[in-house]
Amino acid sequence: MPRHKKIAVFFILLLATGLIGMNIYDNQQKKKQEAQEQRQTTTLEKTAIDRTEGDKERANDFTLKTTSGETIRLSDYRGKKVILNFWATWCPPCKAEMPHMQAFHEKHKNDVEIIAVNLTSLDNGNDALEKFIKDYRLTFTIPLDQEGTIGNRYKAYTIPTSYVIDEEGYIQHKVIGPMNEEMMEDMVTSNG
């Protein structure tokens, strides 16, 4: 075999070995990262849920200021069902969900409270928020999570994330992703 063919075969084998090695290394790194994320998720102590009374899960109380400057506490809404929603103005699924949420609010504002927590720490500023509220004609309560602590506590890592909370403050449902009006109707009428 001529010398230049031997060199070509050598480089092809070297390249193939390198590609196989890189693929194995990438797979190992992905597995390590997934394992680390799983450990982090399971070691989170402070969550949205205070476990009491068997398998009922009480929603963790919080205090936030609304867009109008009013201070609200989640526990102030005991005695009424609550849809607790986490969202941001730049989020396309949140944008799709808001007209449904507003329509639901207009029909059920006496029976169900919508608290749509804006993840302000991740959002595009107050001007964008004010424009969004005006454009979508939102009239339900919108508190501001300036630090991101409430969103983290409720594990709103994917938005929108919503919780349906019963009159006694217990979580009935958690929904990751957008809801339509029919889904909201179904969830507030079911008992968990």
What kind of region is each of these model predictions?
Residues R78, F86-E106:
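Conserved redox-active cysteine motifs that mediate thiol-disulfide chemistry
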Residues E130-E168:
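Short, internal strand/loop/helix patches
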Residues M1-R58:
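N-terminal targeting signals for export/organelle localization
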Residues E53-K56, D61-V82, E106:
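A short beta-strand-turn-helix
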Residues A96, A103-N110, K134-R137, T141, ...:
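Sec-exported extracytoplasmic/periplasmic mature domains
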Residues G18, A35-T42, D166-G192:
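Thiol-/selenol-based redox modules, centered on thioredoxin-like
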Residues V112-N126, T139-E147:
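Thiol-based oxidoreductase modules, predominantly thioredoxin-like and allied folds used
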Residues I83-L84, I114:
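Hydrophobic beta-strand anchors of alpha/beta hydrolase catalytic cores
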